[in-house]
Amino acid sequence: MSPQTETKASVGFKAGVKDYKLTYYTPDYETKDTDILAAFRVTPQPGVPPEEAGAAVAAESSTGTWTTVWTDGLTSLDRYKGRCYHTETVVGEENQYIAYVAYPLDLFEEGSVTNMFTSIVGNVFGFKALRALRLEDLRIPTSYSKTFQGPPHGIQVERDKLNKYGRPLLGCTIKPKLGLSAKNYGRAVYECLRGGLDFTKDDENVNSQPFMRWRDRFLFCAEAIYKAQAETGEIKGHYLNATAGTCEEMIKRAVFARELGVPIVMHDYLTGGFTANTSLAHYCRDNGLLLHIHRAMHAVIDRQKNHGMHFRVLAKALRMSGGDHIHAGTVVGKLEGEREMTLGFVDLLRDDFIEKDRSRGIFFTQDWVSMPGVIPVASGGIHVWHMPALTEIFGDDSVLQFGGGTLGHPWGNAPGAVANRVALEACVQARNEGRDLAREGNEIIREASKWSPELASACEVWKEIKF
């Protein structure tokens, strides 16, 4: 009997390089309910057709490599490969296309945002056939989203914990963000909470530096919270930043926060990483802590319009990984188009079911089923004159965060907090009475300032400030 010289896998195998579109461009493919769908903005190199560029993205982010390999015969590529099933031209842009790619669910580990991103965007962005590449949106199928815990608690549970309903929540980032001692930091926290804010916040880069170690900060902030709660009769919180150099240290800080009895901790989810974030979210659910998420580093990824990843993808990923709040920009003063895009991903954070709407940047219908929602946080350069617009745009399920708009009050931190609380209560009351906040906003603030010297002073200071 002659020895076997040819394996079954090698039958029909032909070495060499072949066009990606022969295997990975499948315009007749009908997407499945279980597929993860991606919309990529593709800018091909000169001479590369959009179908080949889209197929290259599908290949390199799933089963493909640069050459044909004989081990392809050991598996079913048709079952596991990503498929570029449609391309379309981006209106008004030269040589830009949207390539739609479908990925079989079996390519992804359950409950791992880390693995999902490693597959879809991990290796393909440096591809030579592409001049630029941007991931615009993802459709997460129910069969995959159900493998994630999602936010530790969600919007309704947070309201029940805080016993606060029918209005946006108010926050303030303590400034200067770096340099204060723990005791002075705690003093600022107390003054803001005592004045009427619901939350104060560590800034994203407040971790455990020589001038203020984390344990000292946690202790003085907890003292401030309890003192303010006793004086106001309201539940208060401070976002204690648990972000650290290792997951073990991060969890240690969260454990200490829980032992102090505070309601909420914080994490920088992009610099900390999705694995760390998901670990912290699981700990927070198990131990009754709310989790505030800061998006530090997001602009490195999402600022370029033709390369990187849109923030709506990072927002969806955060909802899966876990967080009860996330920063979402302010909208105020931006162009109308930017407003619609921002409200698009705000809905993706809060709502259970979001219809496809290209005018708002939503490429796919998204059904989150029962996954809890995330509260968007409006923060950055806002003050009392913006309160009517913010209340109208973001609605009740939001946190409006005034850093300089609180601490910059000429009379001090507590009067700054009073001014913001009075402005918010006036806007909510006016809205509930049927008044138009967009049209009558300035008048509503002026009327309220007659009864609040703190608000009147704030109105005077910031009357000339515009975006």
UniProtKB/Swiss-Prot annotation:
Catalytic site: 175 (proton acceptor), 294 (proton acceptor)
GO biological process, one term: photorespiration
Site (Transition state stabilizer): 334
GO cellular component annotations of the record: chloroplast
Post-translational modification: The disulfide bond which can form in the large chain dimeric partners within the hexadecamer appears to be associated with oxidative stress and protein turnover.
Amino-acid positions noted as binding substrate in the UniProt annotation, renumbered to this chain: 123, 173, 177, 295, 327, 379
Cofactor(s) this protein cannot do without: Mg(2+)
Enzyme Commission designation: 4.1.1.39
Main location per the UniProt record: plastid
Localization in the cell: Plastid, Chloroplast
Alphabetized NCBIfam families for the sequence: PRK04208.1
Organism: Serenoa repens (Saw palmetto)
Modified positions (N6-carboxylysine) in chain numbering: 201
Name of the protein this chain belongs to: Ribulose bisphosphate carboxylase large chain
Encoding gene, per UniProt annotation: rbcL
Subunit structure: Heterohexadecamer of 8 large chains and 8 small chains; disulfide-linked. The disulfide link is formed within the large subunit homodimers.
UniProt entry keywords in alphabetical sequence: Acetylation, Calvin cycle, Carbon dioxide fixation, Chloroplast, Disulfide bond, Lyase, Magnesium, Metal-binding, Methylation, Monooxygenase, Oxidoreductase, Photorespiration, Photosynthesis, Plastid
EC category: lyase
Binding-site residues for Mg(2+), renumbered to this chain: 201, 203-204
Annotated cofactor note: Binds 1 Mg(2+) ion per subunit.
InterPro entries cross-referenced by the UniProt entry: RuBisCO, RuBisCo_large_chain_AS, RuBisCO_lsu_C, RuBisCO_lsu_C_sf, RuBisCO_lsu_fd_N, RuBisCO_lsu_N_sf, RuBisCO_lsuI
Residue span(s) of the pro-peptide: 1-2
Single GO MF descriptor: magnesium ion binding
